[in-house]
């Protein structure tokens, strides 16, 4: 059975928001410590923020401020369901081109969004950069080569506008993260793919051991290979000392 595609009515939008709250209650009952709303990378909350995907002309679209309403109402619903705003965070990705997302009014929209996020007193705001730092590193750019990436959007934009804890992500290296931290442009940093292929990532960074590159061909599906079988540094050294098998 299929249903014809249609624009959500305002009533249906509120029903979706309510489902977030119900999910939050189940999450808390299951014993989780908190919730991060994924408002980035072209997913539903991000689609409401974008002027190219959100063509509504009601309370949930038509202006930068109205386009922020869905995400803000979802966050309020999560806070109400959990009972503690410090257990709720949100991830955003201003200007990112991912999963078909395109935004033409980035600063106007995210200025309106962040001013409201300040009022919610969340645990944190996490962001993903709109450009791949790994790709940027291949360009002739002295700042990138020197490990300074924090001056690129949206590091300073978010730091200047958001009053709480800021978490940065996006193809980071230890050097890039440390320099951004030293510059005061973020408080915490996310290493997602690096952790997939380096179960001992913290120890590797502490000891300046080289990192194992992740095989993204297995990053989003497939069998069990590449899921949790990457060796630690110590295991790699032991394997090399043993030599080839057979």
Which functions belong to the PLM regions below?
Residues 1-246:
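Flavin-dependent oxidoreductase catalytic cores
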């Amino acid at each position: 059975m299929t249903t014809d595609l249609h624009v959500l009515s305002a009533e249906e939008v509120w029903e979706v928001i309510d489902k977030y709250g119900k999910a939050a209650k189940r999450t808390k009952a299951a014993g989780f410590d908190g919730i991060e709303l994924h408002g980035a990378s072209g997913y539903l909350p991000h689609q409401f923020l974008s002027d190219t995907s959100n063509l509504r002309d009601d309370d949930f679209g038509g202006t930068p401020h109205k386009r922020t309403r869905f995400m803000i109402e979802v966050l309020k619903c999560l806070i109400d369901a959990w009972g503690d705003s410090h257990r709720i965070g949100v991830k955003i990705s201003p200007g990112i081109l991912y999963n078909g997302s395109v935004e033409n009014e980035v600063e106007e929209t995210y200025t309106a969004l962040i001013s409201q996020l300040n009022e919610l007193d969340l645990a944190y705001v996490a962001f993903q950069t709109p450009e791949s730092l790994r790709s940027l590193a291949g360009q002739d750019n002295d700042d990138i080569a020197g490990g300074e990436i924090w001056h690129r959007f949206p590091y300073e934009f978010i730091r200047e506008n958001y009053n709480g804890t800021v978490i940065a992500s996006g193809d980071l290296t230890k050097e890039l993260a440390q320099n951004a931290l030293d510059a005061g442009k973020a408080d915490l940093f996310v290493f997602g793919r690096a952790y997939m292929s380096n179960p001992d990532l913290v120890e590797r960074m502490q000891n300046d051991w080289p990192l194992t590159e992740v095989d993204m061909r297995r990053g989003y599906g497939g069998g069990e290979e590449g899921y949790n079988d990457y060796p630690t540094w110590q295991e790699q050294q032991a394997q090399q000392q043993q030599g080839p098998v057979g």
